[in-house]
A protein has these predicted regions:
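A short interface-forming secondary-structure element
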Residues: 32-46
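Flexible glycine-/small-residue-rich
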Residues: 27, 36-38, 71-73
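Interdomain boundary/hinge elements
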Residues: 3, 63-70
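Residue-level signature of catalytic and energy-coupling elements of molecular machines
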Residues: 14, 34, 69
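Divalent metal-dependent catalytic cores for phosphoryl transfer on phosphate-bearing substrates
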Residues: 1-30
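Short, low-order "capping/linker" segments at domain edges
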Residues: 75-82
Length: 82
């Protein structure tokens, strides 16, 4: 139960950042991956978000070792050829 709560807390911290579409905790809470809205954010904002999330995790959670924060900002373009 504590394990699930920790994962949910990690995801909640990440989702509090502006522009976040998705956040998922992995690796027994050792990593959190965050997806930003590509249209509304810049590369610099992605870096800022990763630092802000890491800082918030350090301040709000107690954990042994490290937690890796990965922020993804991508654009997908799809077209059908017929």
């Amino acid at each position: 139960e504590a394990y699930i709560k920790r994962l949910e807390e990690l995801e909640a911290i990440a989702k509090d950042q502006p522009g976040v579409v998705e956040a998922h905790a992995f690796q027994a809470g050792r990593e959190v991956r965050v997806v930003l809205q590509a249209e509304d954010t810049t590369d610099a904002q992605a870096w800022d978000a990763s630092r802000a999330i890491a800082k918030e995790v350090e301040e709000r959670l107690t954990f042994p070792g490290e937690i890796k924060v990965t922020v993804v900002r991508e654009v997908k373009a799809e077209t059908l050829a017929r």
